[in-house]
Each structure stands twice: as C-alpha cells, then as structure tokens.
Amino acid sequence: MTTELHPLGFFLPENTRLLMLGSFPPPRARWSMDFYYPNIQNDMWRILGLIFYGNKDAFLRDKKAFSEEKAKAFCREKGIGIGDTAMEVIRLKANASDKFLEVVRPIDPEKVLFQIPECVAIVVTGQKAMDTLLSVLPGTEEPKVGFSSEFSCMGRTMRLFRMPSSSRAYPRPLEEKAAVYRGMFETLGMV
C-alpha cells in the first residue's frame, strides 16, 4: 500500500502557548482551504468561532469554505499552533475516517516543542490523535475527555488536554463541544 506524507507543515506562531493536534488531514477533495481542519463538515472552526466571537460562522469565507486568512490570523493573535500527530500514514480506505488511518511515522514532539518555547500545553482532538501522541510520550497519563494530565518533555512540565473530536462523526451538539473547549481555554487564561 502507498504511504501518504503530511501535506501541510506545522503552523507555529512565535507566541504559541497551546499546540492543537489532530490526527491527519482528510483527502484533499474534502478541503475547503489549505489549512488545518479544512473539511467544511468539521466543526473545529465553528467551535472556536462560538467561543471567541459568539458566532459559529466567524471563520467562514462563504457557505462552502472556511477562510484560511481568518483562521491563521486568529491563531497568531491567540498563540495557537496547529499540527497533527501523524506525519506519514497509509489510508486503508479513501476517506477521512481516523479508523482507517495506519500511522507509519508519528510526530517528533521534541522537534516541534523546540520551535515553540512559550508553549505550555498540548490539546488533542480525537482518540487517534491521543493514541499516536501517547506512543511517543511514554509514561504520559491519558486524560479523560474534557480534562488534562501533566507530562514532561525536554525538561518542560506541560499540560496535555483531551478534547472531544470536532468531527461530525462524533455525535454531540456543537454547543456542547464548544463548552468543553471553552473550559480548556479558560484554564489556560486564553479567553
């Protein structure tokens, strides 16, 4: 089977305090922008719009696409870095489901965290992302959804947050997901 390399580099503003990690982007045919969480069916940008602007459509360019410019400007302003836990995968089916992703090469957390010295926390946005990250952070406790645990990397003590998946396949109302994410941002003093 053919492997697929990650199509985007990490987005790491200089002021990154929070690193948000998903699993791997969907197939390009599902993208509405050339940035993270590009699938118009994914709720991440709606969740962030509700929390920070009181408007789930704050990051829409039009009804069928998110605005890459708005998303990047927001991340720079708030100190949010974005990436994924898988750098190379095999898609067992030609869809966006994490269930059919086989991780060939995971993230190198030290390499990424070295670039963002102000980062105090990592948040993962789904079970596949959590499993992949824990595989490269041995001894780290897996937090329950909506909670965090402490871990060390490169002599830094950090928080690992686990949030609900922003995928529509995770059957929770948007407002409920946003409330869980809001708790994390409040804990970090970012909202």
Question: Language-model features: where?
Answer:
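Internal catalytic-core helix/loop-beta-alpha segment
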Residues: E77-V136
